[in-house]
Each structure stands twice: as structure tokens, then as C-alpha cells.
Amino acid sequence: VRPEQRVNVAGVQTPSLYLGDEALNNNFDDVDEFKQMSGGVATVFVRSGEDFIRISTSLTKQDGNRAIGTVLDRQGPAYQRLLAGQSYIGRAVLFERSYMTQYSPVRDASGKVIAVLFIGFDYTDAQNAQFANLKRFRIGQTGSLALLDEQKHWLVPPAGVQALEQAVPVILELAQKPGQG
């Protein structure tokens, strides 16, 4: 990292990050090759203060443009682990898409985290297809499966329920019909 040597990445001034003599800011060769070879996405983040900024990525935003110049979400599952110098492997929602991810910290000679390497595989479409199948699944005439995520949003709502607060009356009604729910 060369913090004194700033590079403009999508309108954001970032510290320059090098691999040997090669600047990684705005260099998309390796991340695009990873995408072509694996079908996944890759990102190089550089640390700037307490933020990690995407300086090279094959990840795209909703508008189809590269997500360069954007920062790692401080509220996301990886952020605190990376600050502590630990990797994160798990789910992340990025630009409204679900990914299975790995974030790995990069340290300088003193052990300070100066950058992050990321790879991710988008499973949004496969997950949506599976949820659609589960929504159609019935147990008996009126029974159904239900899946609630950690933010209490329905991934697969019970039959007849769209909002969490609707679930209790529907479940109570079904419970009053033994053998029919």
C-alpha cells in the first residue's frame, strides 16, 4: 500500500495498492479472469481509514456497472472479522443478490490489515427457484412449509401469509381444524 499515492477509482480517492510492481487499482485483469474461469466474482479492497474500498472487482451493481469505488458495509457480516485480521466465510447480500463468500485479510509486514481479497458465488436464482418450489409444497390439503430468515423476513411464507403478523391468526385457525391443516 502506498497511502501517499492516491488513485481515483470511480470518483473516490484511494490509496494505491501494488502486487510487486503492478498497481491493482482500476486493474481488472485478474478479477475478470477469475470470473471467466469460475463463474464467480472477485474483488480487491484497499483499506482507507476504517473503510475497505473496492478498487478492482468483477462484481456488478444493479445497473450492471462494476461496483468499484464502493465500500464494504460496516454492518455486514465480514467487516468486524476483517478488522480483527480474521477471514469471513459465509453468506452476504451484495447489491440485492445473495452470495456465498470468502473474504481474506491482507496484512503488511507489521501485521496491519491493509487490504482484503474477496471471492463470491451468486446463488440468488437457484435459491429463488428452490423457494418457489417450497411455496407450492403442501402437507395434506392445507399444510405448508415456512422459512423465516434471521431478520424475520419470510423466505417461504406459510400458505395464506405474507406478513409476519399475519402468521399467528392463520396458524391458530389451522390448529382449530384437527386433521385438516
List each model region and its residues.
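Hydrophobic alpha-helical segments, especially N-terminal targeting/anchoring helices
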Residues: 107, 148-149
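Generic beta-strand/beta-sheet core signal
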Residues: 45, 119-120, 148
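Conserved beta-strand cores of small sensory beta-sandwich domains that regulate signal transduction
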Residues: 43, 90, 144-146
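Envelope-exposed proteins and targeting segments
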Residues: 40, 97, 115, 141-143
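Extracellular/periplasmic ligand-sensing ectodomains of membrane signal-transduction proteins
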Residues: 2-84, 92-94, 151-174
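Sensory modules in modular signal-transduction proteins
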Residues: 132-141
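PAS and PAS-like sensory modules
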Residues: 86-93, 101, 179-181
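Conserved beta-strands of PAS-like sensory domains
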Residues: 16-23, 97-131
